[in-house]
């Protein structure tokens, strides 16, 4: 939406490229998560977050867990509670458990965009008073998806290549919503698929896609490098000239 706003303001040249990681822009193709998007349920949810001022991160994580209860709920209930075994040492699970609150205003905006599928039509949404038209976003884009993603089906992520106005490079990685992203080089099981162009039909793209062994991260680094400025020496010290508000990671971590 920010990119469309900049395009409307004639300032899109401030951005060299855009990246969309496991992101759904067309909510008519949102997959299993769309089962939660009926009018009554979402209005009740936004009213609760409005009263509190935020959507609790643990509550949001619980909603997503119930989309895959066998894997994300009962599996651990049997292992940890019934069998008394310790949870597996898995870095992604640890990271996934570190939830973050969402402000009530942002929660409401997300709901409005999703319910009305506002990003698929020019002017369906506004950004700082500017009608949003994704077709005016003409910078190159790098769009990634996970072949086993239950939250953002890869076909839904692929749809973004048709909504944006610039040239897109679509990458289909192994694994699901999180593991397709947290996919560093060195895993012998990792592969990704890529093709030279992005036809309208995702099945047509898949039929012509080439399978590449390894992580997609090096491909992404190359793509970014081709659209970035000249390399400069790294600063000797961290930080900038702005006033420090608090020590990292911030005061929010102490809220209960």
Regions found by a protein language model. Give the residues of each.
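Hydrophobic, well-ordered secondary-structure elements that form the walls
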Residues: 111, 160, 220
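Alpha/beta-hydrolase-fold enzymes
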Residues: 3-107, 225-256
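Short alpha-helix in the alpha/beta-hydrolase fold that links the catalytic acid
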Residues: 153-163, 174
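Short beta-strand/loop motif that positions the catalytic acidic residue
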Residues: 137, 143-145, 149
